[in-house]
């Protein structure tokens, strides 16, 4: 009978996720995931993008109240913009809440001045993430008072859905963008595993409003997908599928990986091949001094390999019990999923 686990164990899995923040801000990041099976870059990239832009919890202003103003088609004495323009500007205020319950913030300003989001009195439970954002222009000797209600939610909610049955007279519900993720783009490139060069590399660019870091946003999106897909797994693994998990090796399964599957320079790869070093287990048993005695193998090649070994928590000069194993090829095939 065909082993069920071969449906997923024989597929290559990404062995690293690299996060790179842009120097000017922590709110933008480049995320690189590799290697992936052919086509999985597009599949995962599209799914992650849709979840990031639609399903993460965030905070937004959902209604405002201005004394003597009953609807959005009014004008405010001393304010250059009408209420509709003021509401449009308020929708651009980015907030972060530390509590789940709604909070009411207050704004008081005296002209002449440009009223900005940083003038809002928030308290300890709410942060304004873009304090320089302009709300309106206030004329000389004029005053502006306003109450702003802030809530937690997800996605984009129209003002009609923010309207509550008990909304006080004069309080105006507004559209709310709760999502903390501002933009997500991705692209798929080829990457190499060993001698195979047509695997996928997924590169995502994520920008948030600062309420959550891009790395955290990506992790939350992945968890949402995991929770949604879990229900589809309607079978139990067979005993033979679990056997690989229960068999214990006296050494790390990474040692069973062939060195020609590492992304080494041509010089380093040729030196290892000429010295009959086939598996990582063969490599880590050598000391640095042993390696430097290898013909054409210099300090640059040594540092290159040390950096790669460090990714697997390995180093030169390791004491590896029971190496090499008698059934090397069988073990290498069995534990292939563990180190890919």
From Swiss-Prot:
Assembly description: Homodimer. The RNAP catalytic core consists of 2 alpha, 1 beta, 1 beta' and 1 omega subunit. When a sigma factor is associated with the core the holoenzyme is formed, which can initiate transcription.
Coiled-coil stretches: none
HAMAP family: RNApol_bact_RpoA
Enzyme class per UniProt: transferase
Gene3D superfamilies cross-referenced by the UniProt entry: 5' to 3' exonuclease, C-terminal subdomain, DNA-directed RNA polymerase, insert domain, RNA polymerase, RBP11-like subunit
GO biological process, one term: DNA-templated transcription
Biological source species: Rickettsia rickettsii (strain Sheila Smith)
Chain spans, region Alpha N-terminal domain (alpha-NTD): 1-236
Protein name stated in the entry: DNA-directed RNA polymerase subunit alpha
Function: DNA-dependent RNA polymerase catalyzes the transcription of DNA into RNA using the four ribonucleoside triphosphates as substrates.
Keyword Nucleotidyltransferase listed: yes
Superkingdom in the source lineage: Bacteria
Domain description: The N-terminal domain is essential for RNAP assembly and basal transcription, whereas the C-terminal domain is involved in interaction with transcriptional regulators and with upstream promoter elements.
Chain's gene name: rpoA
Molecular function per GO: DNA binding; DNA-directed RNA polymerase activity; protein dimerization activity
Gene Ontology CC terms, in alphabetical order: cytoplasm; DNA-directed RNA polymerase complex
